[in-house]
């Protein structure tokens, strides 16, 4: 058995590729069913965010298992092997474990140390459990990754002052406003006519950051009015005008800054829609943090409009990254230790079949000898006395097993453990059962 991760991220693929791999909530069950039906995949879970899609799996055979996951990604994305494979990464065993710990700790994020990824890793654990696709190995790995992510944020300063995708989007708007005025600085958004499209978690974070950057009023559009109004109620100090997506035309006409963050699988804004608007000197900035993208690529270059997507956030991220690199080194040291702990536990499982056979053999001997002893005691031996003798025999077996079992499972080089297992199997004449093969 081998642990593997196959996926892509903002580091390996542009948004136009990532959006084709994104798995929406409505398609997640089908994806789990497909992966669970794969013969080579023993356990599996899926991490799908705006910046990455990663499949974590316990596979029978490394090469065949990874190949099966790649075939799933081809089918899901509709991309050819030639278009997809250059953007994929594959990590195995220790590298896969370390990568997951880095992801959970925020070290592999577009925004170093951002906290939302930890919630997404928690969701990955929950999905794996809900669809009964993770067993003891991945469950242990994923839950330890969550605890590692928490530890990184509590034991280092990586999470302090970290920006998120949403806050980076707001900073990008401030930066572009400043640059349009000939200033390389973040400007207040107080005078901007702002609109947010979508009323999900990312939109909530957007509104929080917009309010903190000087925005006092905005328009909030969503497919359902109730959800938009419910979100608006959480910001009593902000003047929020709610509406439906049917009002998008009017919103485009009167806004100077629009953020999009919907779950739509197709763009809601494209060049055909915008071509009917004459902006004159009134520039409209469109910042899209949706994946798949909410704003079509053909919008770029239209007069009167500037469009940005999640890949454009790099400009803002770079301004904050340098000062955080030393903290990231501290976090990586912690991650290395957590990965080592898991890998030691994983390696110790090599001894489990031998330990189980040894315990089974000794248990058979215990029962046989106990039965002989009890039969010699005669009918006058009470039920209570029988229980005492049986407990005594079990205690002796457990005492005998404790030290060798502890030593067999202790951290040690694989070659040394294999040699110890051979010796135990030879001394106790432990055959290999079908369950161990």
Swiss-Prot record:
Catalytic activity, as annotated: (S)-4-amino-5-oxopentanoate + tRNA(Glu) + NADP(+) = L-glutamyl-tRNA(Glu) + NADPH + H(+)
Official protein name in the record: Glutamyl-tRNA reductase
Record text about domains: Possesses an unusual extended V-shaped dimeric structure with each monomer consisting of three distinct domains arranged along a curved 'spinal' alpha-helix. The N-terminal catalytic domain specifically recognizes the glutamate moiety of the substrate. The second domain is the NADPH-binding domain, and the third C-terminal domain is responsible for dimerization.
The UniProt record lists the keyword Oxidoreductase: yes
Keywords: Chlorophyll biosynthesis, NADP, Oxidoreductase, Porphyrin biosynthesis
Family from the record: Belongs to the glutamyl-tRNA reductase family.
NCBIfam families in the record: hemA, PRK00045.1-3
Residue numbers marked as site, Important for activity: 99
Complexes and interactors: Homodimer.
């Amino acid at each position: 058995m081998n642990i593997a991760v196959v996926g892509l991220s903002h580091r390996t693929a542009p948004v136009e590729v990532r959006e084709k791999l994104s798995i929406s909530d409505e398609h997640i069950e089908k994806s789990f069913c497909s992966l669970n039906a794969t013969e080579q995949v023993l356990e599996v879970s899926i991490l799908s965010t705006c910046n990455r899609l990663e499949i974590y799996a316990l596979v029978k055979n490394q090469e065949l298992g990874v190949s099966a996951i790649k075939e799933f990604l081809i089918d899901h994305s509709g991309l050819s092997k030639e278009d997809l494979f250059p953007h994929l990464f594959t990590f195995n065993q220790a590298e896969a474990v370390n990568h997951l710990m880095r992801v959970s700790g925020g070290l592999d994020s577009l925004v170093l140390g951002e906290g939302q990824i930890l919630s997404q890793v928690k969701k990955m654990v929950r999905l794996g459990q809900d669809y009964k696709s993770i067993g003891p190995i991945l469950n242990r790995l994923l839950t330890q990754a969550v605890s590692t992510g928490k530890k990184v944020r509590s034991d280092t300063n990586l999470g302090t002052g970290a920006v998120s995708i949403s806050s980076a989007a707001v900073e990008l708007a401030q930066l572009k406003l400043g640059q349009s005025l000939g200033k390389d600085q973040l400007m207040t958004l107080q005078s901007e006519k702002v609109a947010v499209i979508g009323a999900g978690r990312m939109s909530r974070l957007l509104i929080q950051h917009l309010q903190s950057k000087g925005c006092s009023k905005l328009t909030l559009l969503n497919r359902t009015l109730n959800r938009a109004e419910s979100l608006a109620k959480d910001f009593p100090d902000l003047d929020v005008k709610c509406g439906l997506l049917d009002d998008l035309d009017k919103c485009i006409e009167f806004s100077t800054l629009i953020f999009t963050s919907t779950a739509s699988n197709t763009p809601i804004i494209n060049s055909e829609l915008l071509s009917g608007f004459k902006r004159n000197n009134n520039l409209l900035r469109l910042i899209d943090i949706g994946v798949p993208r909410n704003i079509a690529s053909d919008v770029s270059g239209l007069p009167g409009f500037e469009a940005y997507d999640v890949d454009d956030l790099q400009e803002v991220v770079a301004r904050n990254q340098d000062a955080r690199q030393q903290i990231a080194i501290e976090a990586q040291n912690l991650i290395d230790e957590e990965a080592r702990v898991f890998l030691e536990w994983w390696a110790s499982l090599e001894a489990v079949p031998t330990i189980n056979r040894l315990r089974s053999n000794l248990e058979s001997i215990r029962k046989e000898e106990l039965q002989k002893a009890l039969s010699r005691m005669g009918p006058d031996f009470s039920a209570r006395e029988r229980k005492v003798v049986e407990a005594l025999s079990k205690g002796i077996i457990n005492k005998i097993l404790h030290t060798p079992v502890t030593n067999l499972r202790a951290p040690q080089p694989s070659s040394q453990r294999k040699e110890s297992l051979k010796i135990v199997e030879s001394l106790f004449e432990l055959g290999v059962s079908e369950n161990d093969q």
